[in-house]
């Protein structure tokens, strides 16, 4: 699909995808790519979907880092995840640029399914903060590779942070540092590898508008709808999207 000559209907769908990503980000802090990229991959080239998400992903995480900066209790954990996440993301992005679109589509679908399964089964493993800080570099590298490859590292990041006894605010701050750092290096890498041109860059920048509108709505939604009900709706939606991506020719 020619991204620069979209019809109005497709453009509207893309805006809704980013708005929905912002909604999920504002409600759970889980990361807008986990919903936006699978939606985008249904309608446009999956590699373009990943590239488009990088800039608004950086933007949304910087907002939440600023919003929750006063809640940090373990800055070392956030720092280690961010630093090693960028290292892994660099290698993942190199693989992303060199591989086929269909491979990226399947990776997006499989990682999304992994996210759904991990959300349904829950996480019975509990880690102390001391152990978490020790394994954070490894988690960061693995999460970074996955992020660079398909733009969705939520299953790894959420599984790790959910094993810790931390507040929602500290959770959002830590995961935003992780996602934000990876988004930054992903953008730089894509530009350096000549995968992103300035037209795509501007379209991605414009996508920050619907995403930023969705974030406060997501925050408000959690006050009206139970978190469990909201998550069930999102998981059902992700199952449908992933199945569609896998079965598409």
Features from the language model and the residues they span:
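Selected transmembrane alpha-helices and immediately adjacent juxtamembrane segments
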Residues: 2-43, 125-175, 182
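Structural signature of hydrophobic alpha-helical transmembrane segments
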Residues: 10-11, 41-58, 102-112, 141-151, ...
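Hydrophobic residues within alpha-helical transmembrane segments
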Residues: 16, 20, 55-62, 79, ...
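Signature of the 12-TM Major Facilitator Superfamily
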Residues: 48-55, 80, 106, 173, ...
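Selective hydrophobic functional segments
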Residues: 52-101, 184-227
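Transmembrane helix exit motif
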Residues: 62-70, 107-132, 219-220, 240-249
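Hydrophobic alpha-helical transmembrane segments in multi-pass integral membrane proteins
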Residues: 91-96, 145-152, 186, 240-249
């Amino acid at each position: 699909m020619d991204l620069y000559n979209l019809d109005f209907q497709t453009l509207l769908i893309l805006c809704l995808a980013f708005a929905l990503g912002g909604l999920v980000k504002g409600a759970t802090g889980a990361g807008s790519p986990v919903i936006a990229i699978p939606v985008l991959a249904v309608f446009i080239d999956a590699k373009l979907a990943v590239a488009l998400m990088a800039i608004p992903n950086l933007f949304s995480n910087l907002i939440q880092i600023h919003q929750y900066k006063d809640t940090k209790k373990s800055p070392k954990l956030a720092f280690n995840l961010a630093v090693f996440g960028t290292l892994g993301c660099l290698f993942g992005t190199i693989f992303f640029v060199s591989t086929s679109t269909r491979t990226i589509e399947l990776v997006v679908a499989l990682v999304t399914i992994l996210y759904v399964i991990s959300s349904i089964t829950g996480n019975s493993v509990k880690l102390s903060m001391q152990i978490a800080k020790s394994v954070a570099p490894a988690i960061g590298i693995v999460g970074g590779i996955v992020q660079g490859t398909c733009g969705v590292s939520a299953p790894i990041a959420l599984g790790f942070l959910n094993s810790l006894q931390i507040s929602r605010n500290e959770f959002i701050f830590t995961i935003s540092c992780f996602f934000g750092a990876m988004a930054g290096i992903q953008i730089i890498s894509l530009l350096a590898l000549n995968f992103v041109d300035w037209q795509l860059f501007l379209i991605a920048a414009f996508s920050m508008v619907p995403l930023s509108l969705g974030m406060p709505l997501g925050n408000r939604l959690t006050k009206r709808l139970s978190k469990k009900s909201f998550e069930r709706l999102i998981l059902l939606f992700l199952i449908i999207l992933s199945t569609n991506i896998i079965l598409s020719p």
